[in-house]
Amino acid sequence: MAKSKVVEKDKKNELDNQSADIELKGQSKNEESKGGKKKVIIVESPAKAKTIERILGNDYQVISSKGHIRDLPQKQFGVDLNSLKLDFEIIPGKESVVEQIKKMTSGKEVLLPSDQDREGEAIAWHLSTILGVKGKNIITFTEITERAIKEAVKNPREIDMNKVNAQLARRVLDRIVGYMISPLLWRIIKDARSAGRVQSAALKIICERERERYRFVPQKYFKVWIDIAGLKAYLTKVDGKKIKPTDITEEISKDVLQKVKSVRLVDIDVKEVRKNPPAPFITSTLQQDAASKLGFPVSKTMKIAQELYEGVDTKEGHTAFITYMRTDSTRVSDVAKEAAEKFILKNFGREYLNESSEVASKKGSKTKGKVQDAHECIRPVDVNITPEKAKELLDKDHHKLYELIWKRFIASQMSSAIYKQYSYDFESGKYVFEASIRERIFDGFEKVYTIDNEPSEKHKELKVDQEYLVEPKSAEAQTTPPDRYTEASLVKTLEMEGIGRPSTYATIIQTLLDRGYVVKKRKTLIPTILGFVVNHYLEQRFPDIVDKGFTAEMEKELDEVENGKKDWKEVVKSFLKEFNKDLERAKNEFFAIDFDTDITCEDCSGNYKLKVGKYGLYLHCPNCKTNKALKSDVFGVIDGNKLYVLEEQESQEENGEKNSVQSEESSANSGNRKFYRKRRTSGSKKSSTKSASSKAKKK
Ligand SMILES: [Zn+2]
């Protein structure tokens, strides 16, 4: 069982360090008084410290700072907007930790591991600044294994200030937006929590999808098909021209049903289709796959992945299982590639080996010695710890995620799956029906991992020119609006739009949920009315902040700071120049929340208005002057300047609950409670929403 959070403490040291709350192992008081070990490694987490200490043994003392130790002040702004001088302070509560670290490192060689990203580099920079250590004291690795750690301590490097600056710029931009906009937001919407830079762009994406769904007008169409020899052939052509399914009208359907009595098989088209193995996981794809296959929210995935990376207690000792989990690189190190190839050869055979991966690894060895992209994909640190073996070492959830990572990685190094695709064309007069099936003739990577659970269907031995008597069938269908986002599909969209980075996807979603701007129902993300109101305000007053293009551009500029192509202060200053204009206007111009709604007043025939008062959002009838509370379980869409309430309906599918375990996407689509827009009426019919109808005191 994994008990990563429980770190054994040396009793004696626990007494010594009680005040400092520092994890310290394997060092006796005697050693300390003699000067003890010469080299000290400071890491952020106790679990990581334990794994590294186990690897390096007696020459090193490994201590943990337990997360960040220095940041912008909690009670002041901390940024001089002219000079961009930053006023950092020790995070309250961390003073004693810092004192302890200072004591333990004085006169010793200090090594600071930096995860392969900006945040890790910044933490190392804060520490080295506080401790006053200079020179080559940064060590880097993407996995906490004996090979990687021993290699890392042999090759320390200097701090990469470009990386640190990119992180400082991000911190300052977020600080400016949060600190400047939030008070304005509170002035207008008392129960708004705050505004964040990247979350605001994500909120807008979610609100826009809801609006799109609301505006969506379903289109009726007909599915027309024939059943022949176990095949389902759909109408695909009329008069020699392809017809889109949604273009099949009732007229066409009726005509087919009336006229088509027999069809002739005119063509069988057979072609080979190769399904290529997926790339190994990066942060975003891991989050999506764990959501759809395991039903894990992204925050849970990241928490477990971090524990697997840092190391967990197992019956065979404290061990790390995977490489660093925040990455957008699919690169695989030569060592890992070789290990995977050996594993595949031994367990599956040569035909299962990805030919291109062999070529790639040979190429890779030629370029050895050259500086390479330091980042790597998310993969097992040892492919020989198979999911079966890991089952005995890990608890259920850790094992599930590890199994997914292991399978995806092995699959990425395997050969393509090969399918034969059979298309059967049946003709009757001007109509052509087509049936298509795929038969798998070689499983390849699908031996260990599936992308889409495609069934393999046996092809049918049919003869061209054969006539068949048929009874065409048809069913009415209608187009459906785009789905609401799930956590998985939102991460995919954020990545596609270039908003956020591997380290921020989980935080973005969590922040929107924590602030009550978005709620999660049946795994889908639904904007609340408060979320819509906040988004409306930001759209009106700070259009850049919620603009996905602008946010993506900022991310690119931060990348350029990291690559040394831009100065971080210039990036922040040019942002401030535009931002200040919006800020001045927002400060000086009156802004009121006053939306029309489609909710009918309970006391007269008028419609309520949505307003904001001392206690938050409420409904007001301008006709009879009564007020009603707006209940939190009411959902709606703000479109134009009007709030349209959505009605919750029970849907027919009863099996939504069962599906949710296997597939987030499928449960999102078949959940048994859905919100529908009210039928737009011509004005005479009015309905009041039940959920908004409880009486509230007048404000
Ligand atoms: Zn009224």
From Swiss-Prot:
GO terms for molecular function: DNA binding; DNA topoisomerase type I (single strand cut, ATP-independent) activity; zinc ion binding. Residues 1-37, 649-699 are annotated as: Disordered. Residues 194-199 are annotated as: Interaction with DNA. InterPro entries: Topo_IA (IPR000380), Topo_IA_2 (IPR003601), Topo_IA_AS (IPR023406), Topo_IA_cen (IPR013497), Topo_IA_cen_sub1 (IPR013824), Topo_IA_cen_sub2 (IPR013825), Topo_IA_cen_sub3 (IPR013826), Topo_IA_core_domain (IPR023405). Mg(2+) binds at E44, D115. Residues 684-699 have a biased composition (Low complexity). The active site is at Y324 (o-(5'-phospho-dna)-tyrosine intermediate). Residues 661-672 have a biased composition (Polar residues). Its EC number is 5.6.2.1. Residues 160-583 form the Topo IA-type catalytic domain. Gene3D superfamilies: 3.40.50.140, Topoisomerase I, domain 2, Topoisomerase I, domain 3, Topoisomerase I, domain 4. Releases the supercoiling and torsional tension of DNA, which is introduced during the DNA replication and transcription, by transiently cleaving and rejoining one strand of the DNA duplex. Introduces a single-strand break via transesterification at a target site in duplex DNA. The scissile phosphodiester is attacked by the catalytic tyrosine of the enzyme, resulting in the formation of a DNA-(5'-phosphotyrosyl)-enzyme intermediate and the expulsion of a 3'-OH DNA strand. The free DNA strand then undergoes passage around the unbroken strand, thus removing DNA supercoils. Belongs to the type IA topoisomerase family. Monomer. This is DNA topoisomerase 1. It comes from Fervidobacterium islandicum. The gene is topA.
